Amino acid sequence: MKKILVRAPFLTQSGYGEHGRFVLRALRAYEEFFDIYALPINWGNTGWLWEDTAEREWFDQIISKTVVYNNAKPAYDISVQVTIPNEWQKLAPINVGVTAGIEVTKVAHQWIEKSLLMDRIVTPSQFAADIYQNTKCSVKSNETGEINNDFKTPVPFHVVHYPYKSDVKEEKVNLSLEYDFNFLTVAQWGPRKNINNLVTWFVEEFIDQEVGLVCKLQVHKNCYMDRGVAHAQLKGLLAKYPDRKCKVYLLHGHLKDEEMLSLYKNDKIKAFLTTTHGEGFGLPIFDAVCNDMPVIAPDWSGHLDFLYMPTKSKKGKTKNKAMYAKIDYTLAPVPKEVVWDGVLIAESQWCEPQQGSFKIKMREVKKDYSRFKSDAKKLGKYIRETFSADKKYKEMAEVLAGESLEKIDLTDIPKISIITSVFNGDDHIEHFMEDIVNQTIFKEKCELILINANSPGNEEEIINKYIEKYPDNIVYKRLEKDPGIYSVWNMAVDMATGEYLTNANLDDRHAPWAYEKQAAALLRSPGSDLVYADMLITEQPNETWSANSSNGKQYNFPDFSYDNLKMVNMPHAAPMWRKSMHDKYGKFNEKYGSAGDWE
């Protein structure tokens, strides 16, 4: 299992924030391969998320775990840095840079220099990768003094697109839209998004018509003051057209994915507009496509990866076809006011959408809406399948790991025997039983062998309740006297019918997927006989994996070696092992009072 550190603005309301969350979701989907750590960072002036969700709870657990680990001597196998390349560092033996690239024709030479710190680079679009890879700069050889004016980064690039979020359920946002035909735009109001022209050209085209434009905008943060700034800017644009018939609506503030979905599915919102100067990917455009909404956009930059789809011609040849309304454009130098030293350079160009073409496309979409809607439905179906979360999470996880990752089919996991000694466990037995039966593969793959070592407690009453519920999964035996814990374990080994064994103490608690992941690790590693895990350290008894007082405090056991085993019993925390080991090495040594599992 690789220790992997993600440094990203994953708690911010930003494109890079969503990119960071995508990386973490992909790693979580393949959690059996990774020990995940995460450091949240700021992203400009954007706000931070405050949603109280299960995912946010998981983020907080990972952050706490990272803080505790970093107070020791952290040693990560891989770092993943989701940010602009200027901030990339060597943080681990393997370093992966994840960036949206730059939405112009060249990257800064600093990016080429920083790329050399990375072992591989991930971008969300082919456009972003091509611009980065094809930019040349001048370098001087330290050995010969020779200058190479055509130096390009030699670091390998991987394109991993954002996934379609099929699990998002719509939550209605109440909009009072006066007209039945409305366009939608979603953006942070900055120079690159070209909002001033979009609004102005829309009003000029539909000044005397019953058409609306919904603008989901923020300038920096989704706060009340920011709303005032956005409202003033929009009001200033519209002041030139006091007698217009068309409507322009400002929608401001943070909307959850579920609420954003309701915009794309609103019966009165018909198409998505963008006059962007360039996109690394274009998430709002992508969301529109995923929900069968016709798109009007310039024919340049990252969003083209999902606005074209392969189609067969009458002659049977397959070619990529534009499934949206294309705006004509020219490439022009970026304005001086947007130049950003080390990031957005003066020698670069970006897309200038043509006013006339934009107006024509809006007119065409409104007039011939059924044709554009038909194309949008075809494209949406294709993108939902091609960009599914399962596919994209696998692509991302494999790129980050640097190797193929194959999940184990649960049907291939052999039977697991859980061996437990019961003694003086009244305070723990109910919570213990609930913890075990809630394992993801308990009913299908597990048998729980409970041996009561003549305990003076009343554990049997609780155990019998669970035997009634799970008669095929629980084996119970009561002894007349206590022979010692390792004698009990050896009895359980003899009784076990599973190919894999694990011990579970009454005061232990497990992640609900613990046995599934341990068994999968054994199945995936035929040369290994035992797997073990790290442990959270809690302050209170009977806490659960999802709600406990560990605050990230944990034991991080080292990789197995005989030298390390002399120092600490690394596999002590509920290991899982092959039953066949007992045929080769015998059973637990009953002479030891507390170290039989170490010996």
Cite the ranges covered by each PLM segment.
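Acidic donor-binding loop at a coil-to-helix junction in glycosyltransferase catalytic cores
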Residues: 593-599
